[in-house]
Amino acid sequence: MSQKNFFDEGKSYGVNDYAGFHFENGADSSLPQVSAQGVVRETDSSNFDASPVASGSGISDVGPFGADFHQLQQHVQTPYGGMTMPASSSSGATSVPPEQDPSLSVSFNRLPKSASTKTKNGRIRSSRREDDNRIPFYDLDVAEGAEDDLQEDFHVEGMKTKSGRKIQRPVAYNPNATALKRKSRKVDMVTLCSVCQRGHSPLSNRIVFCDGCNSPYHQLCHHPPIDDATVQDVDAEWFCMKCQYRRAKQPLETGMTAQDLGLSESDKKMYLSSLPTPHLADLILFCEKSYPSLPIYNPRTRELLGEIRHQLLVSSERQQISLQERLHAKQDEAPSDEPAPVPYTASYVANSGTLYDYPTLIRLAIRNTLSPSKDEIFNWLAQNVPLLPTFHDSASEAIRWMVNKGQLVRSGSIYQIATVEEYPHLQPSLLPTFQRNRKVPKLVPVSFPTDDPQNLCATVL
């Protein structure tokens, strides 16, 4: 097989043109084998002798290559620019290690990446071994330290999916976190007296709250009236009569003197003011029985008793008025005992002013006409129900819907209600509520409807 020329015959090449080629030492290969775009094919280094090429290339810096020429490199300036090429150890060039991160300790594989052999027809066959693409061995301690440094410098704001979309991890729920309080508008409470149900509180008639049940009372509405000194003294406790009677049911324990207990005047006053009024009255009466000569009554006691009785009458009248107002309000809300007019009758629909749906009106028309055809139904509706003059289309649609739903049965031009139940107390009306709650029996026609009423009969299941 003749050798194939890859270059034009008229073009000459210089010795420095070896930069773009890869030379081979074969006897039958006088020209280098070049691949596309100046990429040199990899050849077997065991069959390659670079000494004649280097000696005849005119480059004085490069000496003859030794057996370890693939381990040494040097930088050479050529007309095509600077390049790095193998150099012999005898030329004085130093070994250039591969570029690497100084923080990483790397041990590279120094074996050739591939080996190629020639076939009988002159073609080059490349054979690769499993250890050609060998991964460099890193020092694990140094590598882990470098990864930690990279993680510290790299801050991820959000994760990315395979499609490149950013996602963010949801925030974990913290049950101990304080919830944000919603801003709410403060509403002033309207205080109403428990007796008169009024909220005004003038200076002469203040509203006072009970310290027992927290019920509000006007000074003059409560019985007995509340003293002004109690209102002015903020620290003083006041209980309404209901709370006082409730507390008075508990027995009062006595039997000790103030000297035995070592009580001061303030302690005595504080204890006696905390007692309910009935208990205080019992104590005073007990003291009066023991010492009848004690001057504890007011000279104007008779007049004061008259005023107290008058206030009792006024307060009782106020209570009666408030009770009557509440009773009347409840009676107005309660339904009356008079029977309400029966709805869905002709007179009720005509006079009540309430307009019902078309199915209800059609039932009324059928009940109140002798031969309820469509024209008779429309005439009855026009005379007894306040409808618009153009109600015929809507009424016709309602009749058709009732026939399809089985609520009406058509016998020729006559329509009848599909029910056999009668309500004597509601004649001639039919309540739709009863119709909805009751199951309407299904109608199975024996024959198809015709104009002849006798040709249509229905069987009630």
Swiss-Prot record:
GO BP term, pick one: chromatin remodeling
The protein's name in its UniProt record: SWM histone demethylase complex subunit phf1
Keywords (A to Z) from UniProt: Chromatin regulator, Metal-binding, Nucleus, Transcription, Transcription regulation, Zinc, Zinc-finger
Region (Disordered): 79-130
PANTHER family listed in its UniProt record: HOMEOBOX DOMAIN-CONTAINING PROTEIN, POLYCOMB-LIKE TRANSCRIPTION FACTOR
Entries under PROSITE patterns matching the protein: ZF_PHD_1, ZF_PHD_2
Gene symbol of the encoding locus: phf1
Segments of skewed composition (Polar residues): 102-119
